Every structure is written in C-alpha cells, then in structure tokens.
Amino acid sequence: MKFFRTRVFMLTICGLLCGASQAASNEAIPKGEIRILANELQPDRRTFPTPVGHAVDVNPPAFCWPSPRDYFLKPLLTYDFQLSRSADFKTLEVSQEGSNGSFAQLKQPLAEGTWCWRYRRQGQAWKGPYSFSVDSTARIDRRPPSEVFVKAITNERPRIVVPRVRLEAFRAQCKTNGVTAALCKTATAYFDVELPQCDILMKYSGREKESLWLKDKSGQFRKNNKQVFISTKFPENYIMSQITSATWESGVVDLCRAYWLTGDEKYGREALRWAMRLATFPVLPGNNTTYDGNPFPDGFCCGSYLNALAYAYDGLQSLMTDEQRTLLRNNLAERLRIYYAYYCNRLESRAVEHHGWQMSMPRFLNAAITMRGDLPEADRYLSYFYDVWAARDPELGRTDGGWFGGNYIGANVTTMVEVPALFRQYTGYNYYKHPFYRNLPYWFLYRQPPGSVEDGFAGDGYGGNSRALAWNVAALLGVLDADLDLPVAGWLSDQTSPLAGGKRPDFAWARRMMGLPLENARRAQPPKELPQAHLFPDVGVANMHRDLLNPKNDLHVALRSSPYGTFGHNLASHNAVNVVYQGDYLFVPYGHRHGDGPNSAACYRHTRGHNSVLIDGKGQPFSPQAYGWIPRFLHGEQISYVCGDASQAYDAEPHYREDEIFGRADLLISDHISRGDMQRFRRHVLFLRPSLIVVYDELEAKKPVQWDWVLHCRKMLTADGARLTVDGVKASVDVLSSTPMAATVKTEPMFPAINFMGMYDFENQGKPFPNVGSHAYLSTTAKTPQLRVLALMQVGEQYPIIQKDGGVECGPWTLRAEMNPSQPANLTVSNRDGSAAFVLKTPDRGESVLTETIGGQQKVVKTVDRIPDVAKDVEWDSNDGEK
C-alpha cells in the first residue's frame, strides 16, 4: 500500500487485517449492529404509543399516545384508559375515563410481570392492546398522586405571594438578608407611572411587516413626560423592543411582594392600579396569534399577564372592591381555560415544547393554585399539570443529565426551581429525586469545565466565549446541591458565582417562602477520580477530555448525534466533531443565530456550518425526522472511543420549519437540503491521549455523489493537498480517503452574517458581523456512491504521518484502517509499548474492544451497538446488537 502526496492523501486499498469476514450489503446488517427503522424517535407531535414491547425503567411508567388535536382553539377531546394483566381485559387493574390529556399517570407502582394497556377516544374503538413488562431493575417513582397535591391547597390566602403560615418568619428572614430592601427599592420605580392603554404587540398582532407599531406610542410606559422601562436589549426600530409584558408582570409581582413583606398598603394599592389596567386588555388578540404568527399562548406575554393577575388576586383581596374581585376572577378564569386548552395534547405530545416549559408553566401553576376554591375547574387544571409534569419532566432530557437544548437550558431554570418547590410546599416530597437531576451537574461539567468555553453543541447561540456558567444555572446547581447533597453541583456553582441565587431577590421565590436553602451549608471541594470521558446517550453527545479539571492542559473532543433530530433550538449537526484546546475554541461551528435569513438558513443552522459531511453540497433537513444516535462508547485511560450514526439524518419529509427559515432567506430548500440520498453514515472517533484524534467515516449513498468533509476553525487554516495546518496553534489534520479529495479553505461564509436585530449592539444594527476563522471543505474530485475517510488530528505535539507495513504511524500510535468501501469497515489501533490497543470490529461478533494495561493489570472493555432508551418503542432490527 502507498500513500500519495500530490493534491491529496489517499489510502487506495485495504490496509487492515482482522476485519469482519462477510462484507455488508446495502440490505444486510453488519455483525454487532442495530438498525433503527423508525422515521423519527422524538417527533414534533407524538406518532406512536409508549410503553410498548419492552421492560420499563421506571415504575409506574407514563402511558402516552398520539392525539389528532393540534390547535388550542379546537374542541377538547376525552380519552379512556385501561390497564390489565391480560390482553382480553376481563379484569381491570386500572380504569380511567374522561381525561382531556392524551396520557395516563398511575397513582402507585405496579407489580413485577407483564402488563397490557389500551386507550380510546370516547365514542371510538379501543387502540391496543399494548404490552410491557416490569422487573426489579425499574426505578420506583414514589411521588404522591396528584390528589394529594390538589387537596392540600387550602382556602387560606395569600398562597403564592407568601403562605400566611410562614408570613412572620419570612418577613424576618427577608429583612435580615436584604430581600425586603431590594424589593422596595425596585418597587418604587413603578409608582406614578402613566400606564399604557394597550399592548402594542397584541394590537398589531401578526402585522409587524406593516410597521404600524412604529408610529403608535399608546403602548409606552411614561413618567414625568418621559418614556420609561425602555428595552436595553433591542433598538426601538426592532419589533421586539416593544415587548412590555415583562414590565407588567414585574410591576405587579414586585409591588405585591413589597406589600406583604412590609405591610405598607401603598405598595398593595399601586399593585392593584397596575392589575386593574391590565385586566382591561383583551385576553386574546384578534387573530389569536403572537406578533410573529405563533399561537398566542406560545408567546411570553400571555404567561406574564396570567402571573401578574394571579399575584394580584392572591395578594390584594383585602384592598379590592367586589367589582374588582369579580373582574379579576373572571379574567383569570378565561386565561386559565385558554392555557389548559393550549396545554392539553401539547405538553404530553411534543418532544420539544420550548416556551411552555421555559416560561408559562410555573405561571399557570401559580394561577391555578390561586384560583382553587374560587373556580371549580381549577382542580382539573392542577391535576393535569401535576400529572403531565410527572410524565414528561425533564422535557428535553431523560435520565443521563443531558439537555437537548444545550446552553438554552438557562431559559428553563425558573421552571426547574419554582415548580418542584411549589409541589413540595403542598406534598412534602422532594421532586429532584430523579436520575436526571442527580446527573445534570455532570453534563454541565463535561460540556464546559470551569475556565473553559463550552463544547460547541449549545443549541441556538453557540460560540460565545464565556468560560463560566450563567448565574441562574449556577444558582440551580446550588439548589440541587442543597436538596440532593451533590458536592459536584455545589463546586460547579461556586466556580461560577458563590451564592448566585442569593444575590437575586426574585430568584427561587417559592423556595424562599418555604425557608428552603439555596445552597448546601458545607463548601464543596473539587471532584476527584472522575473519568475523563462521559456519554450522554439520551441527547446524543459524548465529551472526551485529556485533563477535565485543568483547562490550560485540556484537549476536549466532542461528538453529537442526537435522537431528537434537528428541531427547536438545535441545529443540523449530527455526527459533527468539535475540538476545544486549552480552554479555547479550535475546531467548532460557525455562523450567527441572528445573522439574518440567508446566513441563518444556509450557514448557522445548516450542516454546512458544522464539522460534519455534505452530500452533493446539501445537508441534513430541519426536522425531528432527521435524527442520529450513538450506538457505541468505550473509555480507558489512554483511549476513548465513540461512534455516531447519522444514516437517518439526511432524509425527512418536508417540514414547516424549513419553509419558514428558507422562505425568510429567499432560498430554495432543494438547493440546500438532502432528501434520502444518504444510506449510511457512521463516524468513529478515537481520542488517543494525549494529543491524537482519529476520525474514521463510513459513507454510503444511493447513487454517485460528491462528498464534502467539512472542518471549521476559529483560527486560519492552510491547506497543502489534504493536509491542514492551523496558524498560531500546534495543530494539524491529515485526511486520507478511498477516493481522491481536494481541499478548499475559505475565510468568508456562503452568505454574510448581518446584525439585523442590533441585539445589545444598537450602533452596529444592519452591519455585517466580523468574519472569524476559516472553513475547510475537502471534496471528492469525482462522484462516488461510497467513501471511506480517515482523518488524523494532532493537537499539541506534532509527529510525521508515516506509511509502514500496510498501516499508518503517528508518533507512538499505529493504525490500520479498511479503506476499501466494498469491504466491511474496520480499524485497529495500538501503541508502541503495547499498553493500549483497540479494534473496531471483531470477526465473530462485531464487537468493539479496548484493551489497556494499567498498573500491570490488563483491562478489557467491549461493546456492540446499544439501542438508546428512547428507541425502545419504535421499530428496529439487530444482528446481535444489544437490545
């Protein structure tokens, strides 16, 4: 075998012994592998029931099924649910009738064994039966049933401002810790304000392009003939600068809290003035949509108004007239009815329901608690809310602590802190007793160790240079340490901002009311003996480090291939590999979330903007159906290995998100999005410590295509054939391939990123964002249906790439890769002293095997494909993969 240093590096024939004995065809499943056959794993709206055909991992499980109802103004549906030990349902263990939600949450754990369940829409035939099993490995969920929570809410007021039973103690506490003084200072700003006559965004809902709101000043707050509460986030010519709902909410809430903490009626009467003006606003705009065309309850103002009025109704009863009380009660009743109609069949059905979980849910809960006893329907609302939380929390995760939305988790912190505290107030149960919350600190740690930037898979808004967690995330970690005694959470919180939550008087109000701590009393020490790599299979991210707790010596390699697909705040980056070196970005995505239509559609959100692969110049669809997953992961002291499968990530039915995004950009979807040409894309990533990263790609298409192997760098790249070097950093990439590839390095994106919003940067609104770094595209010089790629990334100490004895040597490491696409893929790695070795596929079982000698003892770890938990309810096939 020879390598050619002309315009490319090339491995032209097979260089690996020890390969699988039988070549894989397009139809056969290679040994040890699993093939997921489902169109989607985390659908936009549920398309399959669960649980079906497997042992559940939590007891009792939540039972969920598809619902045809997809809009909040459509009539509510009613469902029946039955559970039995037999498929004939002659004996029923559980029978529930008349539920508006398309799910069932049981009240107690089930006995071990096989169970059958079914559901129906009232008046229609039963769907099912569906079977599942319960065994001793299932986690027991001991949360009290919803009726315990609902019945514990008494008629005593106030309830959400501060429980009357805690009033005196809370007043003393807040006076001592400075909360009262801070709130009173804030509340003073709301006095003597000329209140707007309307919400401009409701008045001109859905008509922002007509710019009528630009000339209309009736939505402004004014004081002493000057506008007050002006947006500091957006310039006045951008429509989001007109959002005033947060001011209405904070005005009423802060004034109510100041009233109860001080007993001074002036705060209460001012809060009532604000609330009564707000109660004159229409509950829904004329077209039932937000200014940008979403269903109105999806917008933040709807939840803010609900919470403001709930606080007023709860805390100002003694100051109201009967007429005012009736007006507020009727207003709240209608708002709660609308939200309940909006939530039903949505919260339980959507894999990604951002705004509800981020913002409106704790506000709905506040209002429903406030209205219990005064509104008969409130009990139903509270029961639904409690049960859907039990069924779906955490919304964008499962048990491993990973969060699909990346650093967008900050938008969920209020919900994660307030809702469990309110439940605990009435039940006494700690709702953080869930594997997700115990594992969440490790996700934060591995994706962004203190002193380092994040892994680049942050969802919307990646690329910030912050080396610390946001204050509210640090505060959440402090709460988790307080409630679960998690030193790693407390340590992470302290690294960002000690007492982060305590510095914000409005943070964790429900916990403060109960006298619950915001942090653990003991100071946490740095965690010890942590593995240098961690897999988060629920969200499809692996993080591999050289020196986890020492950023200046760290090399961080991350791969993403997510079962959630490309939806919500995440991007078309399946099988992308990112590299962070010494705490700084090296090989990471590019683009700007707010870079205007063309850049957002074709660069930032697109696979083109990520370190993955293009097929005929096209990338992964913007759809939940375009998903990936991580079948394999192994970790040792010298070698860590992960495999991402993005075979399904390049095909999906047309999705409305694509229409929106490419429509705004005035670009043709067909020019940028692939539809089904990809047949197989398995990416194998090995981190050979201390400084070598190996990427081995298996690529198969249904026809001859041009392949583009994409790599973005925050520094300048220089190409010499298929060798890339990084200016100013000891880093290089040698790309070997089964078909010749030519490298192109660009310094400008396909479309410039324009600062069209001017967010936090008013002066540069409308100007291009600066171009940062460079972008390499290694493209096949001829179309081919199959391609193998072997990339050797050296970061730090550099070694020559040497062809020897049918393999490749790089420093102390020897690699042998099967580069003939007609043969089964395989890869072996060994180091010079014989202390570490890896084989991708054994001939008999197709196992990946990692062998290391540590302290004179040989350690061997093995794996075949392992199905992710989220895929257990869908169709898949296996050739001895682990189910």
Residue ranges and their predicted role:
Residues 10-19:
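Bacterial N-terminal signal peptides
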Residues 26-71:
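Pro/Thr/Ser/Gly-rich low-complexity, intrinsically disordered linker/stalk tracts
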Residues 239-449, 460:
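Aromatic-lined, polymer-binding surfaces characteristic
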Residues 78-112:
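Recognizes extended acidic, P/S/T-rich segments that occur
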Residues 26-35, 40-45, 132-162, 720:
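Low-complexity, Pro/Ser/Thr- and charge-rich linker/hinge segments at domain boundaries
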Residues 25, 593-883:
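CBM-like, beta-strand-rich accessory domains located in the C-terminal region of large
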Residues 371, 410-586, 782-788, 803-882:
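Carbohydrate-active enzyme catalytic cores, enriched for enzymes
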